[in-house]
Amino acid sequence: MQPAIKLRNIELGSCRPKLAVPITGTTINDILAATTPILAAQPDVVEWRIDFFKDVTNPEQLKSAGQQLRQALGDIALLTTFRTKGEGGELALSDTEYFKLCETVLDGGFTDALDVERYHDEQAVKQIVAAAHEHQVVVIMSNHDFDKTPAVAEIVKRLTSMVDYGADVAKMAVMPQSVEDVLTLLTATNIARQTLPQPVITMSMGDLGKVSRLAGEVFGSCLSFATVGAASAPGQIALENLRPELEDLKLN
């Protein structure tokens, strides 16, 4: 039985998947404006995609924006993510720049969770995980394949590697080219749920993979990404639709 991970006032890995929505504003005004419909919708988690923020490489602007966002969100959990260009994000950074950004986020004291991409310099990954834990910040370690769906064993291997590197939650997103690819992702998720000591988040992207965003309670993914406004990845479903669909599919 995987332990549930406490994230502000929710738990990841217990019962039904929690719901996250992205904020992708490019300015602080855009970011704060996005919180109005989000507060009305009340997701469990907000993912702030800082790679969209035009001042992301300015440490003081980043910390100020994060602190204002934290205040605006009230008690909704905040996950802060810089998605690199190579994994589907907006900006290409060197490893040094990437980890400096992660450190700035931690120093800002505004986030409940930090996304850490697994496939960077291994020592630097371990160091940022340790730093996050010192700040009492949950680490969601991730890998995204926008071209294909690896084999079951490879997906499980990558998720296992994330746990080995100290992830509190391991996340894998893949792109299906066939129905069989979606089944591959779901099979790997079920194996990871049964064998790993930490919760996992998985998704098969695009329209073909939408079913994976509904099936977390059955197969073992603890967080599903929905939309209130702009999507941050292909295949995300509107929160107002996804929430009742998960309710209909709940296990009694």
UniProtKB/Swiss-Prot annotation:
It comes from the Bacteria. Keywords: Amino-acid biosynthesis, Aromatic amino acid biosynthesis, Lyase, Schiff base. GO terms for molecular function: 3-dehydroquinate dehydratase activity. One of its GO terms (biological process) is 3,4-dihydroxybenzoate biosynthetic process. 3-dehydroquinate binds at residues 47-49, 83, 213, 232, 236. It holds the Pfam family DHquinase_I. The active site is at 144 (proton donor/acceptor), 171 (schiff-base intermediate with substrate). Pathway: Metabolic intermediate biosynthesis; chorismate biosynthesis; chorismate from D-erythrose 4-phosphate and phosphoenolpyruvate: step 3/7. InterPro entries: Aldolase_TIM, DHquinase_I, Type-I_3-dehydroquinase. It is an enzyme of class 4 (lyase). It catalyses: 3-dehydroquinate = 3-dehydroshikimate + H2O. CDD domains: DHQase_I (cd00502). Its EC number is 4.2.1.10. Homodimer. NCBIfam families: aroD. Belongs to the type-I 3-dehydroquinase family. Involved in the third step of the chorismate pathway, which leads to the biosynthesis of aromatic amino acids. Catalyzes the cis-dehydration of 3-dehydroquinate (DHQ) and introduces the first double bond of the aromatic ring to yield 3-dehydroshikimate. This is 3-dehydroquinate dehydratase. It comes from Lactiplantibacillus plantarum (strain ATCC BAA-793 / NCIMB 8826 / WCFS1) (Lactobacillus plantarum).
